[in-house]
Regions:
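ATP-dependent NMP and nucleoside kinases share a basic, alpha-helical "lid"
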Residues: 54, 58-105
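Active-site donor-binding loop signature of nucleotide-sugar glycosyltransferases
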Residues: 14, 92, 140-141
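Conserved beta-strand scaffold positions in the cores of enzyme catalytic domains, especially
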Residues: 7-9, 87-89, 137
Length: 141
């Protein structure tokens, strides 16, 4: 979708850690959303995982885009909803399939963390009502 739209993508994975899945949001707002909203390029340090431990890593430059996609869990959270042009919910209904895909992406060593993450997601989405506010629901192949 990003390629088709010529969009810039900022993944929430660049901010979240296993132990801090959502409270990093003010950093995303201050370092990315506020500058872009005011027509200025944005810069942020992405979370990197040397030796399996999170730390702030390389500086990422985000020029003012025509289309910005914030991708990941909590990207369409209730607090940002009034500022979104569109919220897209990506639906993979089977939890085992979601886990399989995530382990394929992140490696077998991440399986236990991913299971805890999925439990967090279920609770987050239930409280936040994210899917109910989505403008579009898509199911990947």
């Amino acid at each position: 979708m990003a390629l088709k739209l010529g969009a810039t993508v900022v993944p929430t994975d660049h901010f979240a850690t296993w132990t801090d899945p959502v409270s990093w949001w003010p950093r995303l707002v201050a370092e990315v959303l506020d500058p872009l909203r005011h027509g200025r390029d944005a810069h942020y340090r992405r979370v990197e995982w040397p030796g399996g431990l999170p730390r702030l890593g390389d500086l990422v430059h985000v020029p003012v885009p025509d289309v910005l996609i914030i991708e990941g869990v909590s990207a369409a959270r209730r607090s940002i909803a009034p500022h979104l042009d569109e919220a897209i919910w990506v639906e993979v209904p089977d939890p085992a399939e979601r886990l399989r895909r995530a382990v394929e992406r992140d490696g077998e060593a991440s399986r236990a963390h991913l299971r805890r993450w999925q439990a967090f997601e279920r609770g987050w989405f239930a409280v936040d009502g994210t899917k109910d506010r989505a403008d579009r629901i898509v199911t990947p192949d």
